[in-house]
């Protein structure tokens, strides 16, 4: 309690020492020291984290110099002091974003900026497709064109097929005039008649090649057959025609037979056909 009373008593004494004249406020006197450094202890105290627990410094023990004189003019409040600029923190909130620091801290980059692509690649995942203009979906149009290109099969009546088959048996190839005459008689187009004759010729060629191959196989199998004598019981021989040029040096033996062992060529010379 005693210290508070001493502080309160010291305020009027300070008013007698300091002179609040226009010259002292404007700093015109050469002998008087500037008053600005006296405000630094208060700023240091306000910027400290634990200002209440810290002990006051040596310069802080005379708060009488900050007490306003009730009889003199009021000193301007320290709130109106120009804030100290900190370039590393950027522009203050009240400045409205003006100045070079605001333009440097803007997060938006134009697409033509060289760092724009690097930033986009860093933000987008590796497997995600990059955003771009959507390609038109032409799947439906392609399917429609594919369906239109597919040829339809012409269905012929029995009378038309009979007339076409009869003409094909007589002549495999038709001239343009014959094709036009046949198409007009059957109420068909020349393209339909031409396509039918092409398919019929292909079928006819396949049939010919199959028949020729079957004939060749039969002829080859007939050439490999050779007649040989077969032995049945009672030594009866089944006479099979064998060329006389075939001769075997080893004699043939027949069981339970009265014939002597003779060479095969001698046996066939004695047999009557």
UniProtKB/Swiss-Prot annotation:
Q: Which SMART domains match?
A: HOX
Pfam families per UniProt: Homeodomain
Q: What Gene3D superfamilies does UniProt report for this protein, alphabetically?
A: Homeodomain-like (1.10.10.60)
**Tissue occurrence:** Expressed in the developing CNS, including a specific expression in vestibular structures throughout inner ear development.
Keywords, alphabetical? Developmental protein, Differentiation, DNA-binding, Homeobox, Neurogenesis, Nucleus, Transcription, Transcription regulation
One Gene Ontology cellular component term attached to this UniProt record is: nucleus
Predominant cellular place of this UniProt entry's protein: nucleus
Q: Where is this region: Disordered?
A: 1-154
What does gene deletion cause? Mice display a perturbation in cell fate determination in the lateral aspect of the otic epithelium results in reduced cell proliferation in epithelial cells, which includes the vestibular sensory patches and semicircular duct fusion plates, as well as in the adjacent mesenchyme.
Q: Give an example GO molecular function.
A: DNA-binding transcription factor activity, RNA polymerase II-specific
Which residue ranges carry the DNA-binding annotation?
149-208
Q: Where in the cell is it found?
A: Nucleus
Extract the signal peptide range.
Answer: none
* GO BP terms: brain development; cell differentiation; cell population proliferation; epithelial cell proliferation; inner ear morphogenesis; positive regulation of epithelial cell proliferation; positive regulation of mRNA splicing, via spliceosome; positive regulation of stem cell proliferation
Q: Where is the composition biased (Basic and acidic residues)?
A: 114-123
Recorded superkingdom: Eukaryota
Family annotation (PANTHER family) = HOMEOBOX PROTEIN HMX (PTHR46110), HOMEOBOX PROTEIN HMX2 (PTHR46110:SF4)
Q: What does this protein do?
A: Transcription factor involved in specification of neuronal cell types and which is required for inner ear and hypothalamus development.
The similarity annotation says:
Belongs to the HMX homeobox family.
Q: What is this protein called?
A: Homeobox protein HMX2
